[in-house]
Curated annotation (Swiss-Prot):
Protein family: Belongs to the histidinol dehydrogenase family.
Active site, UniProt feature: E322 (proton acceptor), H323 (proton acceptor)
Cofactor: record remark: Binds 1 zinc ion per subunit.
Binding site for Zn(2+): Q254, H257, D356, H415
GO-annotated cellular components: cytoplasm; cytosol
Protein name: Histidinol dehydrogenase
Amino acid sequence: MKILTGTINELLNEVKAENNTNNSLQVESEVKSIIEKVKKDGDQALFDFTSQFDGVRLTELRVQTADIQSASSKVDPAFLVALQQAKANIESFHSKQKQHAFLDSEKDGVIRGQLIRPLETVGIYVPGGTAAYPSSVLMNVLPAKIAGVKRIVMITPPAENGINPHVLAAAQLAGVDEIYQVGGAHGIAALAHGTESIPKVDKIVGPGNIYVATAKREVFGLVDIDMIAGPSEIVVLADENANPAFIASDLLSQAEHDILARAILITTSKKIAEETQNEINKQLENLPRKAIAQKSIETQGKIIIAANTQEMFDIMNEIAPEHLEVQLENPMNYLNQIKNAGSIFLGSYASEPLGDYFAGPNHVLPTSGTAKFFSPLGVEDFTKRSAFISYTKEALAKEKDAIVLLAKKEGLDAHAKAIQIRFEEEN
């Protein structure tokens, strides 16, 4: 893991050099072909692609209700308790995000307002196959339920022995309405276009590999999506009082995700930089996913020694990380200096996995610098706003001349006429 020093511009160039997503033309071409086949052949294309990509020959796509209900009996009861605790925290946090309708009548004869309506049908993508991500089920489904989405459709790739019971148990607990054992770009295509079995949805959310991300980009506009997620990333800000073992473990918690994951420490202390580097090498030896984490640390990892605290925040805000840990003395004092970050962890005991699984804020976060303009997944992502207005004749009469003037200045005479015609009988 490189230790970097230099001017702020030199340091930014170092970290920006890796800040790109793999958007190969070959993947895009393959995904377009997959989408077209699903549009043309429907369910049969899903059976074919599931056999080709997952090595599983399906006879039906929908997971039966009995299989979902029996999943809880196949998992450790302690897991179910932990899942219920996480669910309570996620619901508690996200329920505070609910937007509200409003109505005002500040002028005589004028009523204006806003309606908040949930989306009708949402598709949730949950990575699957050999891996299991029940936390992803909760983080994507629960905000949609709180928003009032009527139909939640989940898709996840199958393994040879079906779908992981931990994922099914999480789906039942969260309140998923339908589950289909299909994944990849073909699963995204099915949600966007609909097939004989899978309904077309209004929005698709959830993480996935580059094929899933590319497919989401391709269908955006036909349906809404949450975001295009890149590899996971973390930036830790640390002063001379931080614990190098804590820092190293948190950096590795992201590095083990993916060889392209980015783990960056920014510190004002050379001693902390060197001790953290040693801790990373030490802790790597005991990781089951050592090969992935080590490759990530070697190719994407950085330790930056900043000149001062302000420079730490300047560099971090330019990176706009998915996860930001502030391991500084009195971390709450620095909240105002944070402009661009997906999720923020304050203090030595707010470790990033706390947010991944349990604390309540969402773990579906903007990556690759998009925290400059995107937000974490939330309840508002599953709602839409409509405005309404009502004017009496007397209220419109007071403002008609201004409206007509504006319309004519834009050369839209029919707009002007639509106002004028309502008062012609008086002339």
